């Protein structure tokens, strides 16, 4: 939906009035196109107390392992994204973009913390989340030693856009959400998806 208002038909403007076409509300359009703020929501989940069943994704063994592997990727991945963005933070002059970067870093830090807690619990249940976490840390460490900063920033932008797209699919699919019958897992993933959708390029 366009933010530009539809004005009633009038006689053709003359003089100074002709400079601004009817319906061309520049200020409204600018406001609509300005980036939304990235808000840091300080969440805290408690998987130890609230995940009972071993196959927590609606009793589905395969999907439960898929989620555990994805969760294992997140903490080190989020830290990598933060370092990639932070490297360029001091070069930013735009105050709006600076606020967005600060919000992005804050969100990613909390994502990593909450998924580490979930990974610890899933590992105690027999999942390989922490093994995936260690492998991810090693792999990204090699990447950071070999790849230049602008490449890492490009990777961050691409992966954030990809995960934001997946997040929007999850948020719009009631059937997919219903698979996470354990409330704590569903709440964590939905919160993460909502915030990831704010990072879309």
Positions of predicted regions on the chain:
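Acidic, Ala/Val/Gly-enriched low-complexity intrinsically disordered segments
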Residues: 12, 18-19
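Non-heme di-metal
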Residues: 2-8, 16, 24-201
């Amino acid at each position: 939906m366009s933010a530009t208002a539809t004005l009633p038909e009038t006689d053709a403007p003359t003089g100074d009035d002709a400079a601004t076409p009817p319906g061309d509300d520049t200020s409204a359009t600018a406001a609509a196109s300005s980036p939304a703020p990235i808000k840091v929501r300080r969440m805290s989940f408690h998987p130890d107390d609230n995940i009972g069943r071993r196959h927590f994704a609606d009793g589905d063994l395969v999907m439960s392992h898929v989620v555990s592997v994805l969760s294992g990727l997140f903490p080190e991945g989020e830290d990598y994204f933060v370092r990639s963005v932070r490297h360029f933070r001091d070069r930013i002059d735009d105050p709006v973009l600076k606020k967005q970067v600060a919000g992005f870093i804050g969100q990613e830090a909390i994502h990593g913390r909450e998924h580490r807690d979930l990974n610890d619990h899933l590992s105690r249940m027999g999942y390989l989340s922490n093994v995936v976490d260690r492998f991810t840390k090693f792999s990204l460490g090699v990447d950071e030693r070999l790849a230049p900063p602008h490449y890492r920033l490009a990777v961050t932008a691409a992966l954030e856009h990809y995960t934001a797209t997946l997040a929007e699919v999850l948020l719009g699919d009631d059937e997919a959400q219903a698979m996470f019958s354990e409330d704590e897992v569903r709440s964590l993933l939905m919160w993460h998806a909502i915030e990831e959708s704010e990072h879309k390029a």
